[in-house]
Amino acid sequence: MPQLDTSTWFTTILATITTLFILFQLKISKYIYPSSPELKSMKSLKHNTPWETKWTKIYSPLSLPLQ
């Protein structure tokens, strides 16, 4: 059986890791980050829903009269 030549593995792995690192750096550098992030007020996020203003009753099957 022939011997497996592993002499180029180090170079291949090193080149792959370097290439991936450069690609990820280029990808991350294209993002635009806000200069000063601010909290949004919670009052502007409140939605009016129809069931908040009126009273509703939920009937569970056990509370219904027996037939």
From Swiss-Prot:
The organism's place on the tree of life at top rank: Eukaryota
Pfam families the record matches: ATP-synt_8 (PF00895)
Entry coiled-coil feature ranges: none
Keyword annotations: Acetylation, ATP synthesis, CF(0), Hydrogen ion transport, Ion transport, Membrane, Mitochondrion, Transmembrane, Transmembrane helix, Transport
Alphabetical list of InterPro entries matching this protein: ATP8_mammal (IPR039017), ATP8_metazoa (IPR001421)
GO biological-process terms attached to the record: proton motive force-driven ATP synthesis
Entry's Gene Ontology molecular function annotations: proton transmembrane transporter activity
Membrane topology type: Single-pass membrane protein
Modified residues (N6-acetyllysine): 54, 57
Record localization: Mitochondrion membrane
Predominant location category: mitochondrion
One GO location term (cellular component): proton-transporting ATP synthase complex
N6-succinyllysine modification, residue list: 54
Transmembrane segments: 8-24
Role summary: Subunit 8, of the mitochondrial membrane ATP synthase complex (F(1)F(0) ATP synthase or Complex V) that produces ATP from ADP in the presence of a proton gradient across the membrane which is generated by electron transport complexes of the respiratory chain. ATP synthase complex consist of a soluble F(1) head domain - the catalytic core - and a membrane F(1) domain - the membrane proton channel. These two domains are linked by a central stalk rotating inside the F(1) region and a stationary peripheral stalk.
Assembly and binders: Component of the ATP synthase complex composed at least of ATP5F1A/subunit alpha, ATP5F1B/subunit beta, ATP5MC1/subunit c (homooctomer), MT-ATP6/subunit a, MT-ATP8/subunit 8, ATP5ME/subunit e, ATP5MF/subunit f, ATP5MG/subunit g, ATP5MK/subunit k, ATP5MJ/subunit j, ATP5F1C/subunit gamma, ATP5F1D/subunit delta, ATP5F1E/subunit epsilon, ATP5PF/subunit F6, ATP5PB/subunit b, ATP5PD/subunit d, ATP5PO/subunit OSCP.
Family: Belongs to the ATPase protein 8 family.
Name listed for the protein in its UniProt record: ATP synthase F(0) complex subunit 8
